[in-house]
Design a protein with these regions (language model features):
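Short coil/loop residues immediately preceding or within conserved phosphate-binding loops
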Residues: 52, 81, 86, 127, ...
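Functional-site microenvironments in short loops/helix caps that host divalent-cation chemistry
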Residues: 57, 63, 67-68, 73, ...
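Short, structured beta-strand segments at or near domain termini in extracellular proteins/domains
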Residues: 286-302
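Bacterial N-terminal signal peptides
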Residues: 9-17
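Short proline/glycine-enriched turn/loop segments at secondary-structure junctions
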Residues: 247-251, 277-284
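N-terminal pre-domain segments of enzymes
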Residues: 25-48
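A short glycine-rich, aromatic-capped structural motif
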Residues: 45-115, 135-136, 224-225
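Bacterial N-terminal signal peptides that target proteins for export
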Residues: 1-8
Length: 311
């Protein structure tokens, strides 16, 4: 699947008139500065509760990729489906939230994100539990390292999302619906990013702890929809044809970084965990966030799923 590009002029002309500001615009080249009052407000908001839980994904094999006979929405980049072995690892139970990223920004003296309206006092408390967006791959990697973690590999992300049995969605093979995932309305033809006015028909991002009825087999939330998620890998649509069957880490080099999970603007095929895509690692979009992973030091004891916590 190719993600369509649109000019900033078209997007800003359509969205600013609707009061939507930077929605659906790549803001990689846009920066903001803290104001004294804004930074003071940010420091107060940083005290809000964070979602720091992690989930243990046990060592073992899982079905990675798709079988066209089972999933008619599968793309060629998902072939061939095969068994892959992964060592045990921990992964964030939830997407990294705005308030978690705010703590990092303040601790490392970074500029605020483009969608943070601190100066006008518009950073509502509800935003704290929303997934962070408008972050590049480099931002995501820096945050994970700061938190003592790392970005998950694409294979780790997929196993955490769909378990071992090759299911199409985190909850099984039943089609995605708005009661299970925050994604774009089906039935509308054409890429949303070519028609920015359609964003008015699409749901916004929501808190990372919603959809308890649609968690993955390991209890990981929102591995389908809300925001797509950066992974550690370089992206190559042909990688599966040559990838190792044990702890694959993606191509050794490339020009795009892989992301997974689909987003609130996407249609049903794009929110399947097997769906693969990539983009420039400098990209900062309102549909793209991340979560972190962590190595398990004692693999001998990592044979069962268990919840862990950073604190």
């Amino acid at each position: 699947m190719q993600r369509a590009s649109v000019t900033a002029a078209i997007i800003l002309g359509s969205l600013c008139s609707a009061g939507l500001g930077a929605w659906a615009l790549d803001v990689a080249d846009v920066t903001r500065e803290w104001t004294p009052e804004g930074k003071k407000t940010a420091a107060e908001r940083a005290k809000l509760p964070a979602h720091d839980d992690m989930v243990r994904i046990p060592a073992g094999t899982f079905l990675m990729g798709s079988d066209k006979k089972v999933d008619r929405n599968a793309y060629p980049a998902e072939f061939p489906q095969r068994k892959v072995y992964l060592d045990a690892f921990d992964i964030d139970k939830y997407e990294v939230t705005t308030v978690q990223f705010l703590k990092f920004v303040l601790a490392t003296n970074r500029n605020p994100l483009i969608d943070w309206q601190y100066d006008g006092g518009n950073f509502q408390e509800t935003m704290a539990s929303h997934p962070v967006m408008h972050v590049s791959w480099f931002d995501a990697e820096a945050y994970c390292q700061w938190a003592g973690k790392r970005l998950p590999t694409s294979a780790e992300w997929e196993k955490a999302a769909r378990g071992e049995d090759g299911r199409i969605y985190p909850w099984g093979n039943e089609p995605a619906g708005l009661s299970r995932a925050n994604f774009g309305r089906t039935g509308l033809s054409g890429p949303v990013r070519d028609r920015p006015e359609r964003l008015l028909l699409y749901p916004p991002i929501i808190s990372v702890d919603k959809y308890e009825n649609a968690v993955s087999p390991y209890g990981v939330f929102q591995m389908a929809g809300n925001v797509a998620e950066w992974t550690a890998d370089w992206y190559d649509p042909h990688y599966y044809k040559k990838a190792p069957d044990r702890n694959p880490k993606g191509p050794e080099k490339g020009t795009q970084r892989a992301f997974r999970g689909g987003a609130w603007v996407d249609s049903t095929p794009s929110v399947r965990p097997a769906q693969r895509n990539g983009t420039d690692p400098q990209t900062k979009m309102n549909w793209l966030g991340f979560r972190c992973a962590r190595d398990v030091k004692d693999q001998a004891e990592a044979t069962t799923t268990q919840q862990t916590n950073l604190q």
